[in-house]
Amino acid sequence: MRTLWIVALLLVGVEGSVLELGKMILQETGKNAITSYGSYGCNCGWGHRGQPKDATDRCCFVHKCCYKKLTDCNHKTDRYSYSWKNKAIICEEKNPCLKEMCECDKAVAICLRENLDTYNKKYKAYFKLKCKKPDTC
């Protein structure tokens, strides 16, 4: 029962496409998005603080750049629809901006899967103040 209460509290703070993104990452990598990538390197999770530490961190950097291109929707509050068919993510949105947001999330999930071999536990809870000079998109 205590575990259910903790999960409920965590979900209260989750908005918009974060839920969909988390599902995509789990489906593509087998890893929990929050515990594995929530504070990974300089660019995964909240904050965009510096040059990527490795290829995994670069996936998150490119994802943030993709989100910056979205002008008509908000990745923090807007939600989209997608499906998982034959181990593939299918963005099903009719709304162009929501479809693009879904494509951004799909791309990062695939990138993280393709770079699982670069995942380094020393960057899992990286102290972001160590990050230097942000890369530009």
UniProtKB/Swiss-Prot annotation:
Please give the residue ranges the record annotates as the region Important for membrane-damaging activities in eukaryotes and bacteria. 121-133
UniProt GO MF annotations: calcium ion binding; calcium-dependent phospholipase A2 activity; phospholipid binding; toxin activity
As for subcellular location, the record says: Secreted
Q: Which cysteines are joined by disulfide bonds?
A: C42-C131, C44-C60, C59-C111, C65-C137, C66-C104, C73-C97, C91-C102
Q: Which residues form the signal peptide?
A: 1-16
Got a GO cellular component term for this one?
extracellular region
Note whether Disulfide bond occurs among the keywords.
Answer: yes
Where in the chain is the site Cationic membrane-docking site (MDoS)?
K128, K133
Subunit architecture: Monomer.
User: What is the role of the protein in this entry?
Assistant: Snake venom phospholipase A2 (PLA2) that lacks enzymatic activity. Does not show antibacterial activity. Is myotoxic and displays edema-inducing activities. A model of myotoxic mechanism has been proposed: an apo Lys49-PLA2 is activated by the entrance of a hydrophobic molecule (e.g. fatty acid) at the hydrophobic channel of the protein leading to a reorientation of a monomer.
Q: What protein name is recorded for this chain?
A: Basic phospholipase A2 homolog APL-K49
Say which species the protein is native to: Agkistrodon piscivorus leucostoma
Q: What is the lineage of its organism?
A: Eukaryota, Metazoa, Chordata, Craniata, Vertebrata
